[in-house]
Amino acid sequence: LKNSSLLPHVNAGTLTKEEINKLKPVTASMGMMLENTSRRLTKKGMPHYACPDKVPIQRIRTMDNMGILRIPFTTGILVGIGETWQERIETLQAIQNSHLKFGHIQEVIVQNFVPKQDIKMKFYPKPKHNDFLKTIALARLILSPDISIQAPPNLSLEHPEYLKVGLNDWGGISPITKDFINPENKWPIIKDLNNASKLMGYSLKERLTVYPKFQNEKDGFLHQHIRTKMELLSCDNGLAKEQYIQ
């Protein structure tokens, strides 16, 4: 905050209220993938077995605490790890229920599972493209209109089709750094992504890590340290003052 123009976004997994409060003065927004609310997926032989940080009730509690403490929040669902359609629906409903109570969720990421060589599920198949499109559409139908729907454009060459079924945000795409979660999948070139979006009737606009609706001083979503910095970086409409694509 002192030495750069960056606005920190923290993704630290499950956090207590005390930890969230400690981070708020130096954090613009926070995030944590809910992934799935199914207890079945935590049983032996399933993807979340022996992962105490991924016990659904712990993640739901963190998500709710973010709302109680007025944190602009990002969460999401992981698609293709052995979950059923009913479990996908219940996960999206849990996110919606939290947002209805606290109004703090900025965006929901619909992320497709990608097998990696160093994990136990390395031979597990990727989710089918049509199933993934249906899940994005499902998210758009279940979640409030003020929640953005996001999906990573670097995990599928068919990503422009996401715009047909409800996606309205591509997430963070860097021309400088790699995707540290999926380093084997390069970010698309931003101008190419803009051209692909234009073919679908859209154009890219650069935003800050805090969406415009959460920048209202009266709502208490931002600490004054963050607000002061954000005012230097945002336009009157709340988007980034400097746009990568003019």
For each predicted feature, which ranges?
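Core AdoMet radical
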Residues: 1-66, 72-75, 79-81, 99-111, ...
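Auxiliary Fe-S-binding modules of radical SAM enzymes
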Residues: 3-4, 89-246
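Short Asp/Glu-rich motifs
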Residues: 19-20, 41-43, 84-86, 181-183, ...
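Conserved phosphate-coordination/catalytic loops
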Residues: 53, 57, 86, 126, ...
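Short histidine/acidic/glycine/proline-rich micro-motifs that form metal-
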Residues: 79-82, 178-180
